[in-house]
From Swiss-Prot:
EC number: 6.3.2.6
MF annotations from Gene Ontology: ATP binding; phosphoribosylaminoimidazolesuccinocarboxamide synthase activity
Organism of derivation: Marinomonas sp. (strain MWYL1)
GO-annotated biological processes: 'de novo' IMP biosynthetic process; cobalamin biosynthetic process
Gene3D superfamilies recorded: ATP-grasp fold, B domain (3.30.470.20), Phosphorylase Kinase, domain 1 (3.30.200.20)
Keyword list, A-Z: ATP-binding, Ligase, Nucleotide-binding, Purine biosynthesis
Family statement drawn from the similarity comment of this UniProt entry: Belongs to the SAICAR synthetase family.
Domain of life, per lineage: Bacteria
Annotated Gene Ontology cellular component terms: cytosol
Protein name according to UniProt: Phosphoribosylaminoimidazole-succinocarboxamide synthase
Pathway stated in the Swiss-Prot or TrEMBL entry: Purine metabolism; IMP biosynthesis via de novo pathway; 5-amino-1-(5-phospho-D-ribosyl)imidazole-4-carboxamide from 5-amino-1-(5-phospho-D-ribosyl)imidazole-4-carboxylate: step 1/2
């Protein structure tokens, strides 16, 4: 597989064409951003950690019958993925109240949400990724109703699988965001799953083990990511 020209660079990953029009290479960089890209820093080993973390999680999800774009690891910082027509919407599930939910609704952090909440956000940095609803998605043509329904179904299936995996490692999956796209008409999970895009707390101490450590200036960001990975069986030195 030959990596060719760069298609685009996001906040923490770059995407490259290959000699196969149906495949792309994701390159995970050491860049770390917060507040819609207003704060950016380089954290040593982050690209490698997130690449291997994502590969592990995507493989677990595929084994559970959840279709993803992930194909295989190419190197410490590169993965081969299917080329998707992305839906410009983030699907967010919250198992525990935290982050923007607390700010918007004035609820206390740490409240268990039963059942978990499902939210949609438009991927638009200039607008601050505004919260939207399913009617907006269909009315503005961002996705067909059937494709959005499938994405929602898969988002909750992911929740069932990952809550169990992280619980075995002594952690709480507080919330997470997912992105989906179409591959030959099928809705697949795209982008990545790493501590950059979810909240994870130690089940006993409630210590934050995710990107909130960067947002809130707690330090030890990559050490926390590696701790999470080791708890669920990832060997970052392999």
């Amino acid at each position: 597989m030959e990596k060719r020209q760069e298609l685009y660079a996001g906040k923490a990953k770059s995407v490259f064409r290959t000699d196969d029009p149906d495949k792309m290479v994701l390159v995970f960089r050491d860049d770390t951003s917060a507040f819609d890209g207003k704060r950016i820093e380089q954290l040593d080993r982050k690209g490698m950690v997130n690449n291997k973390f994502n590969a592990f999680i995507m493989t677990k999800l595929q084994e559970a019958g959840i279709p993803t774009h992930f194909e295989k690891l190419l190197s410490d910082t590169e993965s081969l993925v299917k080329c998707l027509d992305m839906i410009p919407v983030e699907c967010v599930v919250r198992n525990v109240a935290a982050g923007s939910l607390c700010r918007r609704l004035g609820v206390e952090e740490g409240i268990t949400l039963t059942p978990p909440t499902f939210e949609l956000f438009l991927k638009n940095d200039a607008l601050g990724d505004p919260m939207i609803n399913e009617s907006h998605v269909e009315s503005f043509g961002w996705a067909k109703a059937s494709d959005l329904a499938k994405a929602k179904e898969l988002t909750f299936k992911v929740n069932d699988v990952l809550k169990a995996i992280f619980a075995e490692g002594g952690m709480i999956l507080v919330d997470y965001k997912l992105e989906f796209g179409l591959y030959k008409g099928e809705v697949l999970l795209g982008d990545e799953f790493s501590p950059d895009g979810c909240r994870l707390w130690d089940a006993k101490t409630k210590e934050k083990l995710d990107k909130d450590r960067f947002r809130q200036g707690l330090g030890g960001v990559i050490e926390a990511y590696e701790d999470v990975g080791r708890r669920i069986g990832i060997d970052f030195d392999a």
